[in-house]
């Protein structure tokens, strides 16, 4: 696993967003994942809650671009990526947000164990 591989995990997630299918996106999260989403005050603790978030979020037709990233290879089974990304929505509006992902290797490939995303305070 190297920086390009970790960035590829984001690309996989972003491609899942483009399907507009919440189950496709949720499948990238570990069963015990935690999501602190960009446009919701509710912490999501499981697949049911994560899917519920993406049902609403995907209605906006989001596509993300990573503006800055910081990859850390913690072990053979755990990696992080944090930085800033910008979402462009179907209506042309945009939001920049800070993000952090903790990925864990599993029998099904790499899964998102923790995902935190928060809109930039200055807008």
Predicted regions and their residues:
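A beta-strand edge to alpha-helix "cap/lid" segment located at domain peripheries
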Residues: 1-24, 34-123
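Aromatic/pi-system hotspot detector in well-structured domains
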Residues: 29
